[in-house]
């Protein structure tokens, strides 16, 4: 990869630091007394403090300078006076190291004394300075004016997602989003642990990808010589644990689905799954709305959150609407008692394309997804799904054509899916067999039959309610994000294609002196192929001009030397 001029200069500074006896990447622990946020809160003049962080700006003014360092909590101002930092004869730490060899982006550690400037700014007078890490690539120079307007923003989505490490440094709002994500998960853990439920881990590699209707990723286990699947859900394993005697289990599950990518879908995502014995879906609705209210309180300090200009109120109770009523209200179609042919005709009548692989469940799902879903902005439980849509759900206690299932819709998006869990092993086997028939018709999202899970149910599972909550989508809503990529540290992207980098040895093989090699690279001639078609005189003139401009302490090139390089290449 060709180095920029700034990168070349930083590498020269790196070498100069070492020449001064300063290790730019020390191994020793550096102990701090404060971070920026705590220091600002506890600040008073005359405190002895030790801070560490990344240099974000410098204002050099001769014998005195200001700098700003950034740590995990924020930024803090430093004041460096040459004679305070270097009280003895040797002023190199200030005059050379700080002023010339350090750059924006470098990590330093400092010790000093707090004081307030004449303009009222909290600052630290630096008495000691330690280089902790030299940055070899310059950070984007994002600027914020007095009115809060951002200039030269690091805003390109592809660059931000590929280089999240840079995004986090220069865009504070991004860091706040992921801190909110952490609060969401902490709040859930506190609630569930307080209820006495057990956090567990279940397999990611599975012989049968059960628990959901989705297309799995397939891999191969060489030692066992069998196909394995990345999990699409952990539901069936958690139910096995309920069979085993745990009354409440939960897991933050990393799931994988080999399907499309858009603003709400990533092939790898996080779902919270909870299963509690002796409960039903009515209890789970109440538990869910109370949990989400607590989560919003933890993130925002209240039960309301702004999402694209719409105020979402997470305070319970949430509206409850049956699937039948939702479709009837928004399409005029009554799904009750309809055959597959009638549902197919109804879909086509309202402009939904169908194919022969779609059974009753898929047709109803399309009706709701295409025509109804977007109407539910405030938190709403869509409940009582047709039995064809819910192969793992207990039949409704009052109507066997429906199931005791709900999905939580917020801002037109599904956030949670929950059931009164099916615990009748014979009924479950029949549901799996119905799914197998759909698979044979070409539905690649139909569920597999998991014989071991059926065996587990035959040992007896108590009445149980379970829920899956999409953590990524929930965080999107709580942080006012419109893309799932904004709430994933490293969203899935096509692999980046890197160039091969500089070939200094290849240049030296042509006869380029070792002293000249990095400067050819810095000038853009980073590989032997880059010299093809160049005239000896033109290359000599360019490189000697480069030597003069950068005041390089190496002999000027002769025409004969350059001719030798090019003839060796050609």
Show which residues each predicted segment covers.
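Class II aminoacyl-tRNA synthetase catalytic cores and aaRS-like
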Residues: 1-500
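Compact, charge-rich alpha-helical regulatory domains located at protein termini
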Residues: 496-570
């Amino acid at each position: 990869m060709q180095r920029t001029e700034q990168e070349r200069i930083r590498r020269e500074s790196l070498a100069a630091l070492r020449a001064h006896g300063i290790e730019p990447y020390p191994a020793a622990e550096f102990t701090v007394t404060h971070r920026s946020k705590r220091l600002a809160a506890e600040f008073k003049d005359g405190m002895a403090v030790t801070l560490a962080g990344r240099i974000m700006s410098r204002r050099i003014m001769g014998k005195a300078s200001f700098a700003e360092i950034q740590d995990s909590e924020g930024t803090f101002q430093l004041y460096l006076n040459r004679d305070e930092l270097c009280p003895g004869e040797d002023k190199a730490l200030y005059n050379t190291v700080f002023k010339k060899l350090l750059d924006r982006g470098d990590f330093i550690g400092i010790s000093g004394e707090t004081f307030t400037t004449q303009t009222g700014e909290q600052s630290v007078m630096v008495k000691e300075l330690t280089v902790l890490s030299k940055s070899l690539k310059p950070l984007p120079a994002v600027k914020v004016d007095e009115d809060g307007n951002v200039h030269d923003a690091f805003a390109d989505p592809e660059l931000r997602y590929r280089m999240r490490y840079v995004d986090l440094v220069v865009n504070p709002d991004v860091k706040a989003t992921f801190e909110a994500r952490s609060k969401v998960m902490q709040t859930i853990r506190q609630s569930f642990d307080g209820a006495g439920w057990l956090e567990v881990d279940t397999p990611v590699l599975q012989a049968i990808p059960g628990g959901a209707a989705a297309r799995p990723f397939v891999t191969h286990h060489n030692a066992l010589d069998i196909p394995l699947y990345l999990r699409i859900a952990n539901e069936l394993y958690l139910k096995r644990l309920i069979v085993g005697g745990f009354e409440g289990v939960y897991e933050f599950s990393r799931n994988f689905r080999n399907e499309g990518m858009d603003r709400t879908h990533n092939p790898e995502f996080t779902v919270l799954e909870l299963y509690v014995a002796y409960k039903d879906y009515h209890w789970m609705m109440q538990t869910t709305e109370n949990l989400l209210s607590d989560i919003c309180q933890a993130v925002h300090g209240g039960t309301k959150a702004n999402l694209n200009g719409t105020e979402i109120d997470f305070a319970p109770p949430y509206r409850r609407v049956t699937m039948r009523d939702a479709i009837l209200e928004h399409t005029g179609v009554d799904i009750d008692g309809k055959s597959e042919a009638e549902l197919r005709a109804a879909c086509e009548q309202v402009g939904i394309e169908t194919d022969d692989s779609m059974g009753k469940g898929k047709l109803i799902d399309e009706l709701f997804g295409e025509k109804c879903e977007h109407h539910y902005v405030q938190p709403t439980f869509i409940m009582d799904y047709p039995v064809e849509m819910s192969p793992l759900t207990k039949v409704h206690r009052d109507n066997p054509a429906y199931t005791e299932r709900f999905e939580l819709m917020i801002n037109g998006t599904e956030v949670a899916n929950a059931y009164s869990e099916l615990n009748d092993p014979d009924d479950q086997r029949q549901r799996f067999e119905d799914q197998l028939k759909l698979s044979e018709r070409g539905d690649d999202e139909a569920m597999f039959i998991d014989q071991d899970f059926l065996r587990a149910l035959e040992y007896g599972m108590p009445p149980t309610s379970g829920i899956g909550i999409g953590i990524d989508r929930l965080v999107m809503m709580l942080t006012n994000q419109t893309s799932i990529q904004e709430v994933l540290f490293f969203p899935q992207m096509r692999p980046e294609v890197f160039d091969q980098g500089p070939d200094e040895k290849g240049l030296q093989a042509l006869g380029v002196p070792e002293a000249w090699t990095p400067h050819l690279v810095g000038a853009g001639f980073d590989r032997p192929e880059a010299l093809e078609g160049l005239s000896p005189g033109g290359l000599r003139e360019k490189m000697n001009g480069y030597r003069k401009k950068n005041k390089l302490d190496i002999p000027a090139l002769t025409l004969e030397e350059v001719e030798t390089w090019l003839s060796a290449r050609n």
